[in-house]
């Protein structure tokens, strides 16, 4: 018998227009080349060899090209897209966070299969650190970061880069399926409380209970207005020689008025107090009547009276 696998790298297999093969995976930092490929770490896409593109072009693969990655040793799986086909044969390059989700080490085997995923309508994320709350607009930051992703899988911990800092988010829920495509989709995003977040404790003021309740019935009289209750001041700044000691005010000395319970809105009533006239005032008015020519005349030059 002859073995048809005479090459070091596995040959892709086709089952009913489905791409399926195994690659040895490495992190993007081990990708040889003059250009810095740190942009691959910021997304959810992998780099595959040119032979994969040749096989995919012969199949009736719907775009965008989405793949299911499976680590059979740990029974872990995730989904991703493809960025380029420039890797060496038999090798694929993955972002570091994706290798952590799959529990893969450098050079580990991963099963790659082409899949079709439904378009996402809802997703829920849980930040893995309370530092994520320092971001002013987290939804806008996440929307910008997800442009480098092709799909989401429930249970994955994705990594996004913002202001030169890496934030990890766990995908708690996706709809309509556990794995969804987020390319050209209208998706509602929600956040769960960050891992390790504690709500600030409210300071409750414990008031000491008294043996008996205080009687506040006498306070109403003290709150009434009392005219000229202050102390006077002189212009020269001196104080009076004898200052009378103010007598304490009792609640009964100041009486409050009784409200008019028959008051009607929009009606004004002028209340006047009737006071009896004093008899002395009447006598003064009677005695002080006007009498014409009752005074004495005066002249500028004194003249003697004729005998």
UniProtKB/Swiss-Prot annotation:
Signal peptide: none annotated. It is found in: Nucleus; Cytoplasm, Cytosol. GO terms for biological process: cellular response to misfolded protein; ERAD pathway; negative regulation of RIG-I signaling pathway; negative regulation of type I interferon production; proteasome-mediated ubiquitin-dependent protein catabolic process; retrograde protein transport, ER to cytosol; skeletal system development; ubiquitin-dependent protein catabolic process. Pathway: Protein degradation; proteasomal ubiquitin-dependent pathway. The modification Phosphoserine is found at residues 129, 231, 245, 247, 299. Residues 231-256, 288-307 are annotated as: Disordered. The keyword Membrane does not apply. The keyword Nucleus applies. Keywords: Acetylation, Cytoplasm, Nucleus, Phosphoprotein, Ubl conjugation pathway. It comes from the Eukaryota. GO terms for cellular component: cytosol; nucleoplasm; nucleus; UFD1-NPL4 complex; VCP-NPL4-UFD1 AAA ATPase complex. Found in adult heart, skeletal muscle and pancreas, and in fetal liver and kidney. GO terms for molecular function: cysteine-type deubiquitinase activity; K48-linked polyubiquitin modification-dependent protein binding; polyubiquitin modification-dependent protein binding. The modification N-acetylmethionine is found at residue 1. Belongs to the UFD1 family. Heterodimer with NPLOC4, this heterodimer binds VCP and inhibits Golgi membrane fusion. Interacts with USP13. Interacts with ZFAND2B; probably through VCP. Essential component of the ubiquitin-dependent proteolytic pathway which degrades ubiquitin fusion proteins. The ternary complex containing UFD1, VCP and NPLOC4 binds ubiquitinated proteins and is necessary for the export of misfolded proteins from the ER to the cytoplasm, where they are degraded by the proteasome. The NPLOC4-UFD1-VCP complex regulates spindle disassembly at the end of mitosis and is necessary for the formation of a closed nuclear envelope. It may be involved in the development of some ectoderm-derived structures. This is Ubiquitin recognition factor in ER-associated degradation protein 1. It comes from Homo sapiens (Human). The lineage of its organism: Eukaryota, Metazoa, Chordata, Craniata, Vertebrata.
